[in-house]
Amino acid sequence: MRINMVRQLSISRAVSQPELLTRKGVSFLFLLFMVVLTAPNAMSSEFEVQIQSLTAVDRQYMTEQRKTVEGLANRLGRRVSGIAARDLDTLQEIIDRRWVDAEDVQTQQALGIVFGDLLAEELDFDWVIYRDKKGRSRALRYREEDIYVFPITLISRRLSAGAALSVESLFEEQLQKQRPKLPGARWMPN
């Protein structure tokens, strides 16, 4: 028995075997891919500062950080009281005793949170999330004004660099720097 094969009638390739990616298709996908990859960079150069309220996670994290400092203060027979003169002295004692290593960024930041709480109380600032093209930070903000302080960074950068740090001097420096920026500053006592 012999089988005769008959050739298929000629029809266009598009109908008989559609190609998934033609050169035009590959070029289009490459162009689309490049646009998607470069879009965030284009936007980041125009990225404006975004301010948000603290999230529940931020508040919980900051509470835990305060507990870390409270534990260090307890080793001195003290507690974090919210009274600037006492707490600044406590922070200074913790730093002077070198209880926080230069590599222990988390505890350094905990000290910055307590330091920030004292500034916030003195200047009537609130904790917010400050997001810019460099990243996300916890910062202090005066009401709805564009007046910010970054107390966590103020402390942690100095400690991680091993720089001498006078917490009280830094506190006074920030008060002197921020008070003139506040609305009604002309009438505020120094």
Question: What would you call each of these model-derived segments?
Answer:
Residues Q109-R158:
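Amphipathic protein-protein interaction modules
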Residues F47-E103:
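N-terminal low-complexity, intrinsically disordered segments
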Residues R23-F33:
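Sec-dependent N-terminal signal peptides
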Residues D104-Q108:
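Solvent-exposed, acidic/flexible segments
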Residues A139-N190:
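A recognition module on extended beta-rich or small alphabeta surfaces enriched in W/G with H and D/E
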Residues M1-T22:
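N-terminal secretory signal peptides that target proteins for export/translocation
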